[in-house]
Amino acid sequence: MSDLGSEELEEEGENDLGEYEGERNEVGERHGHGKARLPNGDTYEGSYEFGKRHGQGTYKFKNGARYTGDYVKNKKHGQGTFIYPDGSRYEGEWADDQRHGQGVYYYVNNDTYTGEWFNHQRHGQGTYLYAETGSKYVGTWVHGQQEGAAELIHLNHRYQGKFMNKNPVGPGKYVFDIGCEQHGEYRLTDTERGEEEEEEETLVNIVPKWKALNITELALWTPTLSEEQPPPEGQGQEEPQGLTGVGDPSEDIQAEGFEGELEPRGADEDVDTFRQESQENSYDIDQGNLNFDEEPSDLQD
């Protein structure tokens, strides 16, 4: 699942006027409050200005999707709520038909993302809450991906460090509620492949692996945020992650070390801690839905 997808539903164009009931100006343009039923089965009720949707309105797609909020010259702009056919929804700011600014996305599996958006993508500071486990990622996002300084918070411990391409990288630490923290770093390593896999084309699968260094008392964590990333060129679209950004449900990110038991060992031994005992932690479980973009149109007779 994803908060947007590859399919687009377009609003009717200027040549497909449909039926209209409402106010008009002196030159006959739709102006004021009105209702329109479009030839494709979509409907719009709300404010018009000089023949275009402008102000508060509700646009209902024939497949059940619905947008209620602000329009500026036929485009979603300002505050608005978009409800998708699968029941997921976005509530927040829009700019030029894109999720842009502060907003909350409620996924169909009850996960939520709260934070900044840029060109339809999670971008900036944000919090992703995993409903099933109660864990949450709090930190930086770049073009829809977990990237930069962040905390991954679990029930009785948390990981503090940096992420890149949705994976933890470099120095970091695990902080435990019992009053201690373990310092170490995530190193990229090749995963083991079975015999059948080795016979096929050689594909390098790199995963982050935790190497513990030492245990200390609790200390204040001061994240150093990475420099602000430049905005993507053109229209940004967040793809199903695992789909490709969320069209198919997510691409599981499996990093050893987010959950498990702490096993302190001698300083001269390599220690891989927090191994998952049962189910590997996939901490970017985006759910998806279709993206319905409205094509600008001059709705006037």
Swiss-Prot record:
Tissue-by-tissue expression: Expressed in the trachea, ependymal cells, oviduct and ependymal cells (at protein level). Germ cell specific. Specifically expressed in testis, and to a lower extent in ovary. Not expressed in somatic tissues.
Assembly and oligomerization: Component of the axonemal radial spoke 1 (RS1) and 2 (RS2) complexes, at least composed of spoke head proteins RSPH1, RSPH3, RSPH9 and the cilia-specific component RSPH4A or sperm-specific component RSPH6A, spoke stalk proteins RSPH14, DNAJB13, DYDC1, ROPN1L and NME5, and the RS1 complex-specific anchor protein IQUB. Interacts with RSPH3B. Interacts with RSPH4A. Interacts with RSPH6A.
Subcellular location(s) of the protein: Cytoplasm; Chromosome; Cytoplasm, Cytoskeleton, Cilium axoneme; Cytoplasm, Cytoskeleton, Flagellum axoneme
InterPro entries, A to Z: MORN
Composition bias, Polar residues: 279-290
Domain of life, per lineage: Eukaryota
Gene3D superfamilies reported in the protein's UniProt record: Histone H3 K4-specific methyltransferase SET7/9 N-terminal domain (2.20.110.10)
Main location: cytoplasm
GO cellular component, one term: extracellular region
Comp. bias regions, Acidic residues: 1-20, 249-261, 292-301
Residue ranges of the region described as Disordered: 1-41, 225-301
Stored Pfam families: MORN (PF02493)
Described purpose of this protein according to its UniProt entry: Functions as part of axonemal radial spoke complexes that play an important part in the motility of sperm and cilia.
Amino acid composition bias (Basic and acidic residues), ranges on this chain: 21-31, 262-278
Keywords noted in UniProt: Cell projection, Chromosome, Cilium, Cytoplasm, Cytoskeleton, Flagellum, Meiosis, Repeat
Name the UniProt record assigns to this protein: Radial spoke head 1 homolog
Placement of MORN repeats on the sequence: 20-43, 44-66, 67-89, 90-112, 113-135, 159-181
Annotated GO biological process: axoneme assembly; epithelial cilium movement involved in extracellular fluid movement; flagellated sperm motility; mating; meiotic cell cycle; spermatid development
